[in-house]
Amino acid sequence: MDQTQGHTPAGRLAGKVAVVIGAGQSPGEGMGNGRAAAIRFAREGAHVLAVDRQIESAEETAAMIIQEGGSAAAFSADVTREHELALAMQMAKKRWGSLDVLHNNVGVSLAGGDGDLMDITEDQFDNICRINLRGTVFACKHAVAIMREQGGGVIVNVSSAAALGKYPYVTYKATKAGVIAFTEQLALQNAPYGIRANCILPGLISTPMAVEARIQAWNQTREQVSAERNAKVPLGRQGTAWDVANAALFLASDEANFITGISLAVDGGRLLNRI
């Protein structure tokens, strides 16, 4: 349950400018990770540019923030198009004067046609790579250019616990592992510029994209999908988008100002199954 409602002008991100890529969400019940992060950042005082391929969904997120008294705007960008990502970063700086936080929260697996090694097609593989990995790289490229010039900033990339744990679908696992490797390189190469970069590794999170895709792919009810996923988590339940958003907020805030290059699992202990 979200217990942090209300805009906080003197909050942990007070006066900061945050771009959230993937701030809309897929159709279905519940809250998506990107929308939750955008709302959470705004509640802690950030100006938020909600970026999504579906402008209506981004506008919905921005409207939710503004209704609570926060500061937000919506922007349409497809992460497979570099120039649109560049425009998003430029818009944030032009509107609010800086770019302090970039949160990349885009990824597809089953919804993008992923499969096991013997089933995946070249087109499916390339499409998922463009969304999951290339989009993150080029969003960071254009954010870093601004952050270097202004003397610092924070990047929080969303990878996945699937990058390190068991996962049956080849492209999602490979691309999310790539996000970890890229973020480590990003952190090391940009530390001299005052830029921090970290990853979040969500586990089984009850978001519209994750649950709805499996309802359709497995021909199961919502209750069946949820029960199966809950049983795989040592803490006995799926996480929520707010769990991921709270981790993103911590890494984006000055509380984490000596943390860079890490991968923070938000998975209810699921990666412990590797031990």
Q: Would you name each region that the model predicts?
A:
Residues E29, G115-D116, K166-A174, Q185, ...:
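Active-site loop-to-helix junction immediately N-terminal to the catalytic Tyr of the SDR YXXXK motif
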Residues V108, A145, L188-P192, N257:
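Alpha-helical segment proximal to the catalytic Tyr-Lys
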Residues G113-L117, T121-D126, R229:
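Substrate-binding pocket helix/loop in short-chain dehydrogenase/reductase
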Residues C140, T175, T183:
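Active-site helix of classical SDR
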Residues S160:
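Residue(s) in the substrate-gating loop at a strand-loop-helix junction
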